[in-house]
């Protein structure tokens, strides 16, 4: 069942990516047609590395903070205001192409065409001959600072994303180009191990063994004086490479401990957990900040790889800090009264609050609303808390009694009965702390099965599974317990289904007949039926009816007759009728 859920998530993200590609396919086609010297797929690869092939506008940004990353625009992710750090490649593309900056920002076709024209001009100037030469042009048109050798990692990371996209067969099929066979080792040399690492690299410099260590400068973080007791979930509103580069900008005065790449979940650590990163205002002192490569209203950035990588990281953090319990991960996206806690700002308390792993939007004195409504908190909670013991019950009938429950509970029960049965859960009592303690029931053998419901303020009453397995999951917060709940469960074989009621065909039947014949004209209209002998004499009165009727023929002598039927006054259908 879990594999099914993950497959559905992957399928959904693939569909959204395909929709994005199809939506802007014409923009890329026109650009390649105008500038055939640009290798097929390269424009899409650059766009995907920067924007996941989404046309970014101001509507994709929420943060107005001065220290937020510079905004990128259009399919190609061009920066207008680099805030004195990023290169302003929107202006350069405009100058090279002759297109106005406002048109490049507003129109996806112009955005790609302007970039392609600028790329072609630079290619001619550089006398591009090899693919490596093309990558140098990509660098020239990037917003990322060129930097000294020690600061090359963000640029290399962006170029790696471009090249790995081109080598990816599934991306090639989706975006309509022949997959490349680039030798990444030849292109990136010894840097390839770090650029391609997911969870295989052991980096002794980082707190988290699977993370790449690429430190932010000391100007962008401070000394921690308070104990760590929380985790803040962010999204970048920019690319992975761009975020890493931005945290190296002393003027930004911003950083996070970790940054996670959307495509494969790669983790880069930039500030040691023992130090105070600057990511959540007053919560900096006691929290660890994790940035996820995403825009809050572009759902396909939130990949399965990124969720899993982030959950693995948080689980590792929980193992090292007694003050952070995975059960205290935020998951209450919507309350029974309709309040959505994953949209807008919701102060869930400060350092002593129950919820220890939550979004930027959930801490006091904040202006950011990340990670926003597309972040699946309930799924994230399940990933962080994988390994919870499961109580398995078998048989045809029994009781579940979970009264007087405790704090910080996560309990899971799986009930399985004999095949060809359905399980009914009948709750005789149900009393949970409003808005904080919850019961889920799933139609299958684990918490990834289809959800039958979630309950908090109202009793489930009777809940019936579709098969012979049902799963219950209960969670409580860190304080205030109510009476709990009890239910009786019983497995029963469902009653055999009623035979389907088939629509009778248009016509006359039975035929031959002895008592009655059924006449059906197939629609609810005024109709008539008349019966004649072979000499043309009407032997029964004309019967008028709506749609269908029965005619008593028991009084007719045995023999052959002719029956006329159809819409009133027309009776266009004629059938031989045999009376026994």
Provide a role label for each language-model segment.
Residues 1-6, 16, 502-509, 513-580:
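C-terminal outer-membrane/trafficking sorting elements
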Residues 4-9, 13-34, 188-206:
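N-terminal export signals and maturation junctions of secreted/periplasmic proteins
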Residues 22-168, 174-175:
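Catalytic glycan-binding domains that act on GlcNAc-containing polysaccharides
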Residues 37-39, 68-71, 132, 222-227, ...:
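Extracellular/periplasmic catalytic domains that process cell-envelope and extracellular macromolecules
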Residues 158-212, 225, 299-389:
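Basic/polar, cationic surfaces and motifs that engage anionic cell-wall
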Residues 179-281:
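N-terminal catalytic cores of peptidoglycan-degrading enzymes
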Residues 389-499, 514:
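Domain-level representation of secreted and single-pass membrane ectodomains enriched
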